[in-house]
């Protein structure tokens, strides 16, 4: 979408750019650089330099780089601006930092849950393929321990979201090969013994 907005502004020879803003924008090292999305969000920029009172768009936002606007995991957008209408609220830096840090902790918990589910799927496949009874018993014990870990991780994730007023994002804890049957077996194993 960033490329389309830039192309349309170039075709229309539009100079003033308005960048969107949201609570929880990454703050990088806290400096005035493209990695600090909080610093450059919700402001007007000059695309070409024709508006001397405004900072340059690409240099300020890092548009076109991984760390900048429309880069890695960036949720910001931009479009033509008019210097009069800016619907984006300015957020308190501490409030923004707290929201970003909480979202990063939430992403970490989601990643660990996905990793544990992947391990459980692999263990279930290994158990089903095991021909040696001793190996099968060892794998089943490991499966039970891992299922208990998953149950603990899910409880921790739900409590973390509730304690911090965050929405549980079930799509972020799904993996491709995790079925209802896998969930049922995992819960049964976690509650056994």
Each predicted region: which residue ranges?
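Domain-core detector
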Residues: 1-69, 82-193
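Extracellular structured ligand-interaction cores
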Residues: 73
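Catalytic core of tubulin tyrosine ligase-like
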Residues: 76
